[in-house]
Amino acid sequence: MSRRCDLTGKAVQTGNLVSHSNHKTRTRFLPNLCNVTLISDVLQRKVRFRVAVAALRSVEHRGGLDAFLAKADDAELSLGARAIKREILKKQAAAS
């Protein structure tokens, strides 16, 4: 399982830990990922994702999973999130 957010694409970054004596040690900065179950209002079901906490806050800010996925760029979404986005858009198009 990759250390990548399903919704925003946030992934592991690398860099240096720099001491007071300017000694550099390579390190990995991991995203704060958590497994969450989000509810889609359009699909009327629960969807499980592995997302960064910052992405979870963004989902709430935009008004829920459906609004977040509608506005999100496909390039940064995981394959599962893209499939859910297509389902949501298809169901919204059929409803209108």
UniProtKB/Swiss-Prot annotation:
Gene Ontology cellular-component terms listed: cytosolic large ribosomal subunit
Coiled coil: none
Xref: InterPro entries: Ribosomal_bL28 (IPR026569), Ribosomal_bL28/bL31-like_sf (IPR034704), Ribosomal_bL28_bact-type (IPR001383), Ribosomal_bL28_sf (IPR037147)
Keyword set, alphabetical order: Ribonucleoprotein, Ribosomal protein
Single GO MF annotation: structural constituent of ribosome
Top-level division of the source organism's lineage: Bacteria
GO biological process, one term: translation
NCBIfam families: L28
PANTHER family: 39S RIBOSOMAL PROTEIN L28, MITOCHONDRIAL, LARGE RIBOSOMAL SUBUNIT PROTEIN BL28M
Protein name: Large ribosomal subunit protein bL28
Organism field: Methylocella silvestris (strain DSM 15510 / CIP 108128 / LMG 27833 / NCIMB 13906 / BL2)
Gene name of the encoded protein: rpmB
